[in-house]
From Swiss-Prot:
Residues 60-86 have a biased composition (Acidic residues). InterPro entries: S-antigen. Keywords: Malaria, Repeat, Signal. Residues 59-265 are annotated as: Disordered. Residues 239-257 have a biased composition (Basic and acidic residues). Residues 1-23 form the signal peptide. Residues 97-239 are annotated as: 13 X 11 AA approximate tandem repeats of P-A-K-A-S-Q-G-G-L-E-D. It comes from the Eukaryota. Its main location: other. It comes from Plasmodium falciparum (isolate FC27 / Papua New Guinea). Sequence repeats lie at residues 97-107, 108-118, 119-129, 130-140, 141-151, 152-162, 163-173, 174-184, 185-195, 196-206, 207-217, 218-228, 229-239. GO terms for cellular component: symbiont-containing vacuole. This is S-antigen protein. Pfam families: S-antigen.
Length: 265
């Protein structure tokens, strides 16, 4: 008999534990109980403390409202940021065009001086010392005259340490330097052109045009580039008679000058 009582006693406590842990409890909220009915809760122990899944409907609803509030707050923040950006853009567009053309400076004189108030300092590139300004910001006049280089010899050689290399235009190979930087001697003698015929024609592909000094019209070429034959025969002078050049008079003048020079000699 005692054994039966002890077994039933233990079974009763096991039943209570199972009921309290996985028991079926109705929702206490009447409005929600009509909608959702009964819900299972996961409890811990005998004190009905909710754990993990043990949330009431009103708790779930409050959590949902909290999430909605967070979303509204984030949306409001984004709207505020957009409004601030719009105001900044509006201010940038509504600024004075004259001020905008002056780099944001209100004073035109200051804007023309690169933001400097002193005109003399502005003309000296922001330097207070006129001598230093004339020397490109260098304190040593000798160094300034040498392009910022301390060694006069190096300065005279264009910044190159090797005099031979400096005399060759910075090229190490003397042959290449004498050929204008070209490796092919034939190409160098042809002015950088690969075709000898084109090189002999001054870079022109048409031999006839090359023999005419680059002019397409043979008649114009024979007249020294002048379109009027009469003007060409007069050496480019437009006038006739006493204004036209006289070759015989020129030759006579030259001979008389030579005779006078011979007399003095």
């Amino acid at each position: 008999m005692n054994r039966i009582l002890s077994v039933t006693f233990y079974l009763f406590f096991i039943y209570l534990y199972i009921y309290e842990t996985y028991g079926k409890v109705k929702n206490t909220d009447k409005e929600l109980s009509d909608i959702y009915g009964t819900k299972y809760y996961l409890r811990s122990g005998f004190f009905n403390s909710k754990k993990c899944k043990g949330h009431k409907y009103e708790d779930l609803q409050a959590e949902g409202e909290g999430e909605n509030d967070k979303e509204e707050d984030s949306n409001n923040e984004e709207m505020n940021i957009d409004e601030e950006n719009g105001l900044i853009e509006g201010q940038g567009e509504s600024e004075d065009p004259a001020k905008a053309s002056q780099g944001g400076l209100e004073d035109p004189a200051k804007a023309s001086q690169g933001g400097l108030e002193d005109p003399a300092k502005a003309s000296q590139g922001g330097l207070e010392d006129p001598a230093k300004a004339s020397q490109g910001g260098l304190e040593d006049p000798a160094k300034a005259s040498q392009g910022g280089l301390e060694d006069p010899a190096k300065a005279s050689q264009g910044g190159l340490e090797d005099p031979a290399k400096a005399s060759q235009g910075g090229l190490e190979d003397p042959a290449k330097a004498s050929q204008g930087g070209l490796e092919d001697p034939a190409k160098a003698s042809q002015g950088g052109l690969e075709d000898p015929a084109k090189a002999s024609q001054g870079g022109l592909e048409d031999p006839a045009k090359a023999s005419q000094g680059g002019l397409e019209d043979p008649a114009k070429a024979s007249q020294g580039g002048l379109e009027d034959p009469a003007k060409a025969s007069q050496g480019g002078a437009e006038g006739h008679g006493k204004h036209a050049p006289n070759k015989e008079n020129k030759n006579k003048n030259k001979e008389s000058i030579k005779n006078i020079m011979n007399m003095f000699i």
